[in-house]
Amino acid sequence: SAQTYPIGLALCAHCGLAQLSHRVDSSIVFERYFSESFPLTENLVLERKQIPGFERFAQSTIVKTILSVGSGSGRSLQRYKRKGFTVIGIEPSDHQTNVSRNLGIDTLTSYLTETAVEEILSKYGQVDLVLVDNFTKVPHPAHISNVEDLSEYVNNLSRLVKPNGCVYLRVPYIGSILTFGLVDYVYHEHQSYFSYRSIKQLFASVGLHIQSAHLCSN
């Protein structure tokens, strides 16, 4: 029979960050992601919704370089490359990285580690826009909501982005989960579920501030 694990959320009364009260080893919960022998299909509907917002940002600032953390097979970045941006991917899956490189996307096989940050800074310097989103139909092991050390993660993000640059991220919102009883959004891959205050405090700890926040329908 299949192995089962308890699941529950622990909510911080101070900042509103919710995290799993029982964590399962990442090699178990992300086994499917790394065992796929074909490119994981990007969520194209999600991607189309993102593009207009990025274009408005690009028009108001000088955006030349875009870095995607957990870039999957690179198809989402390929659209930005066609628009003239320099695009870079960080992707822990060897298979996904190879697919991405075959599409012409310069992709580093790694999680968002200090070593990966040093390599990117050495090769490209800081970037204008960092994307942290899940472009695949299964939870991504390199997404901010799925990592154990949030402080290290956001510190690495802050090192990658230029002083006048931007970090775009989409995270599970604990407010909607609690208000509407969205228990099917809680599973072992997602270790953290964020409130506005928790994101604000987390990024303020590394000198970043929220420029805008929106509640998405998906």
Task: Give short role names for the model-derived ranges.
Residues 151-166:
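A short glycine-rich, Lys/Arg-flanked "PGG" loop and its adjoining helix->strand segment in the class I
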Residues 208-217:
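Conserved S-adenosyl-L-methionine
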Residues 104-119:
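Conserved SAM-binding strand-loop segment of SAM-dependent methyltransferases
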Residues 169-192, 196-198:
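Short, glycine-/aromatic-enriched active-site segment of Class I SAM-dependent methyltransferases
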Residues 127-149:
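A short SAM/SAH-binding and catalytic strip from SAM-dependent methyltransferases
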Residues 118-130:
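A short acidic, Gly/Pro-enriched loop at the edge of an enzyme's catalytic core
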Residues 66, 130, 167:
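Receiver (REC) domain switch-region micro-motif
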